[in-house]
Curated annotation (Swiss-Prot):
<keyword id="KW-0472">Membrane</keyword>
<comment type="function">
    <text>Provide a mechanistic link between auxin and plasma membrane H(+)-ATPases (PM H(+)-ATPases, e.g. AHA1 and AHA2), and triggers PM H(+)-ATPases activity by promoting phosphorylation of their C-terminal autoinhibitory domain as a result of PP2C-D subfamily of type 2C phosphatases inhibition, thus leading to the acidification of the apoplast and the facilitation of solutes and water uptake to drive cell expansion. Triggers plant growth probably by promoting cell elongation. Regulates branch angles and bending.</text>
</comment>
<dbReference type="Pfam" id="PF02519">
    <property type="entry name" value="Auxin_inducible"/>
</dbReference>
<dbReference type="GO" id="GO:0009741">
    <property type="term" value="P:response to brassinosteroid"/>
</dbReference>
<dbReference type="GO" id="GO:0009737">
    <property type="term" value="P:response to abscisic acid"/>
</dbReference>
<keyword id="KW-1003">Cell membrane</keyword>
<dbReference type="GO" id="GO:0009733">
    <property type="term" value="P:response to auxin"/>
</dbReference>
<dbReference type="GO" id="GO:0005886">
    <property type="term" value="C:plasma membrane"/>
</dbReference>
<dbReference type="InterPro" id="IPR003676">
    <property type="entry name" value="SAUR_fam"/>
</dbReference>
<dbReference type="GO" id="GO:0009639">
    <property type="term" value="P:response to red or far red light"/>
</dbReference>
<keyword id="KW-0341">Growth regulation</keyword>
<protein>
    <recommendedName>
        <fullName>Protein SMALL AUXIN UP-REGULATED RNA 16</fullName>
    </recommendedName>
</protein>
<comment type="similarity">
    <text>Belongs to the ARG7 family.</text>
</comment>
<keyword id="KW-0217">Developmental protein</keyword>
């Protein structure tokens, strides 16, 4: 599955939605005065991966990688961007996610 250039506008809108959603995650965390989670460094966002929904903090630069965009498309197809978990859930096994992110880094 390849990311099409013609869908650049759609991808941009999707990325903005993801970042907006991720900046206002869950009510269980401590937030700064701007409403951002204290445990997420600037330029990063949390994702939940695998059956146990393990939380990972990833840099926003991942949003420019075609392989990561494929995971985001799968997440949208499976969960949409509004679901009970409150954050962005990636529908793959942790081992696959860790392998992919280590290649991107």
């Amino acid at each position: 599955m390849a990311v099409k250039r013609s869908s650049k506008l759609t991808q941009t809108a999707m990325l903005k939605q993801i970042l907006k959603r991720c900046s206002s995650l869950g009510k269980k965390q401590c937030y700064d005065e701007e409403g951002l989670p204290l445990d997420v460094p600037k330029g990063h966002f949390p994702v939940y991966v695998g059956e146990k929904r393990t939380r990972y903090i990833v840099p926003i630069s991942f949003l420019t990688h075609p392989e990561f965009l494929i995971l985001l498309q799968q997440a949208e197809e499976e969960f949409g961007f509004r679901h009970d978990m409150g954050g962005l859930t990636i529908p793959c096994e942790e081992v696959v996610f860790l392998s992919l992110t280590s290649m991107i880094r």
